[in-house]
Amino acid sequence: LMNQLIESGNVYKQKFSADPRPLDPNVPSSFLQDFVFKNFMYSKQDDYEKQLTQLGIMEKDAYTCTCYMDEVGNTPAMGEVLSWSESSAVVYANSVLGARCNRNSGIIDLMGSVVGYVPRFGLLTDEGRKATWIVKIETTKKPEAQLLGSAIGMKVMADVPYIVGLDKWLGGELDDAAKTYLKDFGAATASNGAVGLYHVENITPEAVKYGKDLIAEDAKVYVVDDAELQRVYESYPVIWKKKDAKPKLCFMGCPHMSLQQLIDWTEKVSQSLKEAGRARVCIPTVFLSLIHI
């Protein structure tokens, strides 16, 4: 299909980015792993990247799930209609930036970008952006972004939540720290549920502009307190055979880390090593990001 588009001259109307590559030469791997990855699992990766170049990808390294970051440059404006399919990027664009995008399939994403149009339904409409859940945050401390997102995602599934009380822990404004928190929070709502849009009272742009007018009639209520977060935390199963097995590799950055997260985690690890009198971490650790520092 992509070759047919290229041969017919139907390239994208505007430059685009793509999701992360499956392989990174900076990640440790064995000879056998390299052989299997490059000759079997991802043998078509080079061909795929050539196709994306011909279709109009932004640049040779524009492979990230956080394309909306300022450092990347694929940042939509409020109200702009998108043809995206990466779930964590869709929920961020809708919620934090106020753009409009459905949780598209890869084919809809592809075709929408080529022709410059997408079907108008769901989260592209005013009615589809109304919240059918009110989520009340009643925790005694700032909730972990991923855990809170998981709890809300599993509860509301594909519905739109209007979140009350989280602004208390985010400082009351949409600054870089709040955006980073909401990036990780939103990704969890999208992966543990199917959330494509959330509103945070006094924080996200549509919630600031419209307030409680965004809440639909007969909206359901979900209260998140310390006990509820603990319940969700304890509900996660151990998926490996040996619970006490030693990890071989640690990955951090899904979605990709922001520049500030890279700086913060580098400082945290460096300081912890210094305090422990160690020169290296005991488990090889990879920070995932498109940004190079």
Write out the residue ranges for each language-model feature:
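Intrinsically disordered, low-complexity segments enriched in small residues
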Residues: 1-11, 52-60, 86-286
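A generic, well-ordered mixed alpha/beta core segment in the N-terminal half of proteins
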Residues: 11, 18, 22-116
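Conserved small/polar residues in nucleotide/adenosyl-binding loops
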Residues: 291-293
